[in-house]
Regions:
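Positively charged n-region of N-terminal signal peptides that target proteins for export
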Residues: 1-6
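Sec/Tat signal peptide C-region and signal peptidase I cleavage site
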Residues: 21-26
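Extracellular/periplasmic metallocenter environments
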Residues: 27, 107-151
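N-terminal edge beta-strand
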Residues: 34-66
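Short beta-strand and strand-turn-strand segments in soluble, beta-rich domains
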Residues: 51, 96-104
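Beta-strand cores of secreted/periplasmic/IMS beta-sandwich domains, seen most often
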Residues: 58-82, 117-125
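Short aromatic-acidic-glycine turn motif
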Residues: 87-98
Length: 151
């Protein structure tokens, strides 16, 4: 019985050691990502003529690189930057808008007329993702785009 107890304690110790190693590794990786300079990419949601489009409507990112996606809305209407599948495949460091900084998972960003927001993230999963404005009628009017993440 003592042998089984010792094996159990040893297994529990090894499991705890494994978890602490993974936490340290995750902290190191996160720290390394934060040291990368963010690559600046800008997208306009609409334009001064109130056309329903993203400019540019095609975005390309490389997995593992840190980006600052600057979203601006020069139009007189609110717009959404909606790309849920893309957002599920990235690590978001933060979104900054005005004097507010938001941390955690982001799936959609709403920009009111004249607004600007900076979304700092690292793509993790390669693929092609649909971008759209989810304001009623905007997707149907052509306010769509594509996001590509390569390895």
């Amino acid at each position: 019985m003592k042998t089984i107890k010792r094996i159990y304690i040893l297994a529990l110790f090894m499991l705890c050691l494994s978890f602490s190693h993974n936490s340290a590794l995750a902290a190191t990786v996160s720290s390394d990502l934060l040291k990368q300079p963010a690559i600046e990419v800008s997208v306009s949601l609409g334009n001064a003529a109130n056309e329903l489009k993203f400019e540019p409507n095609s975005l390309e990112f490389v997995a593992g690189k840190r980006y600052n996606l600057r979203l601006t809305n020069p139009s007189q209407m609110k717009h959404y930057f909606t790309a849920k599948d893309f957002a599920d495949g990235i690590w978001t460091q933060k979104v900054e808008a005005g004097k507010v900084e938001i941390k955690g998972a982001i799936h959609e960003v709403e920009l009111k007329p004249g607004a600007t927001a900076d979304w700092v993230f690292v793509p993790l999963k390669s693929g092609k993702y649909t971008l759209r404005c989810s304001v009623a009628g905007h997707t149907e009017a052509g306010m769509t785009g594509e996001i590509t993440v390569t390895n």
